[in-house]
């Protein structure tokens, strides 16, 4: 039996993935599944560049606003939920379009990675928490880099949850996260066609800077304050890029201007890491983000109809 086709569009932040995916969905009777680890959170709209109702243009979107900011959500959870959405779209006779910049989420689908359910070793977790308290998250980041440099290329030095996961996997299995994932790959359920957007670095960085300014104008600081004040314990989601820096401003560790500049800098660094990630997949078909959307849609249609 022929597998259902699924179009995947990756690429760095601010490269125009959303606009392209919506126009593509309109052209091919598609529906969109988000692969963005921050857009899954409710209440976090501005800093995650979540598409609003007008922007969606009546195209159904899945995997947006599915959990509250303090909830835990793993890559395994994403894979299970996203596949359910993809099946639903296929059953309707429509074409699923997976779109986002979270490489871990995309890889979980296209490589059908089975994530081992490891029990949390509370004693070891406490040891890591104590070490972090004493020497900072940077120390754990460096430790994780020594153990699993390949996995750490894709993980931000602020991403406490994933840094701990790399260390805990190695502690419990004696294998790196990458080794474990390679052993856990299966034949994918769908026929995924992977596309990614790239563009001139200067233009991309300019777009990132502009986007951050627009987010601040739209009320990013107020959005972060609301979440910060609402939850007793600081949610992990506020460790995310664009939120963490505003928390530092709220706590008086940075001025407003410093926080904004830091978001721009970290976003540019993140874009660089995203591009590195997508380049690792040799089957990725690259689209030029400076081209008109219609041109990129034409390329996508040619490829999926081969």
Question: Which functions belong to the PLM regions below?
Answer:
Residues 1-306:
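Phosphate/pyrophosphate-binding catalytic cores of soluble transferases and nucleic-acid-acting enzymes
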């Amino acid at each position: 039996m022929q597998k259902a086709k699924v179009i995947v569009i990756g690429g760095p932040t601010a490269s125009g993935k959303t606009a392209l995916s919506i126009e593509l969905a309109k052209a091919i009777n598609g529906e969109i599944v988000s692969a963005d680890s921050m857009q899954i959170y409710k209440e976090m709209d501005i800093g995650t560049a979540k598409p609003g109702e007008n922007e969606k243009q009546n195209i159904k979107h899945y995997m947006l606003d599915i959990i509250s900011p303090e909830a835990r959500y793993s890559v395994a959870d994403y894979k299970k939920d996203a596949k359910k959405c993809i099946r639903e779209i296929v059953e309707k006779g429509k074409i699923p379009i997976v779109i986002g910049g979270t490489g871990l989420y995309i890889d979980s689908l296209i490589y059908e990675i089975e994530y081992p359910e490891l029990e949390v070793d509370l004693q070891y977790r406490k040891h890591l928490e104590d070490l972090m308290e004493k020497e900072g998250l940077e120390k754990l980041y460096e430790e994780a880099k020594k153990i699993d440099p390949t996995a750490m290329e894709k993980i931000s030095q602020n991403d406490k949850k994933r840094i701990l996961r790399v260390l805990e996997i190695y502690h419990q299995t004696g294998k790196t996260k990458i080794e474990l994932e390679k052993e856990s790959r299966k034949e994918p359920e769908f026929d995924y066609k992977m596309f990614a957007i790239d563009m001139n670095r200067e233009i991309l960085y300019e777009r990132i800077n502009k986007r951050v300014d627009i987010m601040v104008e739209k009320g990013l600081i107020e959005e972060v304050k609301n979440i910060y004040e609402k939850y007793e314990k600081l949610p992990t989601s506020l460790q995310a890029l664009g939120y963490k820096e505003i928390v530092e401003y709220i706590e008086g560790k940075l001025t407003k201007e410093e926080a904004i500049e830091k978001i721009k800098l970290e976003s540019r660094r993140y874009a660089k890491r995203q591009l590195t990630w997508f380049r690792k997949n040799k089957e990725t078909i690259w689209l030029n983000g400076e081209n008109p959307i219609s041109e990129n849609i034409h390329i996508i249609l040619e490829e999926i109809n081969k």
